[in-house]
Amino acid sequence: MNRKIIAIIPASGIGSRMNAALPKQYLTLQGKTILEHTVAIFLNHPQIDKIVIALSANDQHHQHISLLTSDKIQLVNGGASRAESVFNALQSIDEHSWALVHDAARPCLKRSDLDKLLQITDQNGAILASPVVDTLKRAEGNKISHTEDRTTLWHALTPQFFPTALLKQALQQAFDRQQNVTDEASAMELAGYQPTLITGSNSNLKITRPEDLALAEFYLMHSLEK
């Protein structure tokens, strides 16, 4: 199937839970920023035609990253939320393409997982995800209400992969209805689609708290040694 695949990286957040002087995507691992590690995954993949990165309008840090000057990369202004940043990025790409949305703070994506996801051609799209293995408790305040059945529960990861036109339509519909969407799949679900779950590695963690940095560095070091 001959189709254009555009990677979209929303990177306009500040990562307040990191308690760092810089937005978390500009913290360094193995001598490179988290954003550089993330972008390189797609820059080096032969099936990715273009990368669109949504940055805060006030972001000055990206100017010091030479990797972002590649002809394959386009920078756009992000929005007030992740969904708005993705929507802004979608405006700049061909509606006949497929959009591959990935968190800027997930630098440990495995090439094999990405390759599995890119095989999807179903118009419902697909996401990387991992089955829930922990016992989950529903709470009322700080008290346990009941235990959830985890057998059908998955952790949503990224990338998330959808036809561009359908994703744009789904996000616009969610905005119009003032529905809260925390990822692209939730917008597609609200629009009536059923994305496929593709099992991804647990090493594809999202760096959110300071302790995540050491684990991400371990995974990156391990992948470089192979």
Curated annotation (Swiss-Prot):
UniProt keyword list: Isoprene biosynthesis, Nucleotidyltransferase, Transferase
Lineage: superkingdom: Bacteria
Catalyses which reaction(s): 2-C-methyl-D-erythritol 4-phosphate + CTP + H(+) = 4-CDP-2-C-methyl-D-erythritol + diphosphate
InterPro entries: IspD, IspD/TarI, IspD/TarI_cytidylyltransf_bact, Nucleotide-diphossugar_trans
Biological process (GO), any one: isopentenyl diphosphate biosynthetic process, methylerythritol 4-phosphate pathway
Residue numbers marked as site, Positions MEP for the nucleophilic attack: 150, 206
MF (Gene Ontology): 2-C-methyl-D-erythritol 4-phosphate cytidylyltransferase activity
Marked site positions, Transition state stabilizer: 17, 24
Keyword Heme belongs to the record: no
Pathway linked to the protein: Isoprenoid biosynthesis; isopentenyl diphosphate biosynthesis via DXP pathway; isopentenyl diphosphate from 1-deoxy-D-xylulose 5-phosphate: step 2/6
PANTHER family, alphabetized: 2-C-METHYL-D-ERYTHRITOL 4-PHOSPHATE CYTIDYLYLTRANSFERASE, CHLOROPLASTIC
NCBIfam families: ispD
Main function: Catalyzes the formation of 4-diphosphocytidyl-2-C-methyl-D-erythritol from CTP and 2-C-methyl-D-erythritol 4-phosphate (MEP).
Designated name of the protein: 2-C-methyl-D-erythritol 4-phosphate cytidylyltransferase
UniProt organism field: Haemophilus ducreyi (strain 35000HP / ATCC 700724)
